[in-house]
Amino acid sequence: MRRASSCGGAVAGSPSEAQDGGEDDGSLRNDTSHMSFEELLELQSQVGTKAYKQLVTGSSTKKQSSRPPVQKGCVADKHRPLEMSAKVRVPFLRQVVPISKKVARDPRFDDLSGEYNPEVFDKTYQFLDDIRAREKELVKKQLKKHRSGEEHEKLQHLLQRMEQQEMAQKERKRQQELRLALKQERRAQAQQGHRPYFLKKSEQRQLVLAEKFKELKRSKKLESFLSRKRRRNAGKDRRHLPLSKE
């Protein structure tokens, strides 16, 4: 309350001072109105042209603002809205309400999705194998209908892709079975009091390759596999040979 009264007193005192100054300027202008032209020229030479014009016209050379002065030190209510100039340009992308940044989350690599266990995953989604088998048979039927053309190429490419995925899944299952067998063997050695032996990755790859050869031999596809491998290795060797000079 004291702050408001002090501000009010400061504002109330300013008009009286302005009124006294206005009366003095009016009396001086009345005096100059009765002076002769020679006296006015002499007065102008004494006080200067700028002061003489201000005295005769009664206006300052500087433009005075018609708005009342802003009392910066006096605040009537601190809870009132902030006054801002209407001439300030509002930004085009003004953010009124803060929006939290969206963070992309991949469930495959997120801890909230749990730890990936291939054995549990295969048991949970085992029904997908039957769906893939039915889709493969459907693609084969469609391939028999379209013997040539662009549709035939698309179906052929799709069938090859499905067969490659099936082979990769079988290979992954074979490796899982091998790891499970090694784990059971180490557990049996520990129960018998022997120190368990952990195979190196190179030894595990050799075991997987041996199992793959056994599977190919049982299915009578070993010769075709070896011939493809020999052709692939021969192509690699030719790339490393120096070019013949003509």
Curated annotation (Swiss-Prot):
InterPro entries: RRP36
Coiled coil: 144-192
Subcellular location per the Swiss-Prot or TrEMBL entry: Nucleus, Nucleolus
Motif mapping: Nuclear localization signal: 228-231
Transmembrane portions of the chain: none
Cited function: Involved in the early processing steps of the pre-rRNA in the maturation pathway leading to the 18S rRNA.
Protein name: Ribosomal RNA processing protein 36 homolog
Gene: RRP36
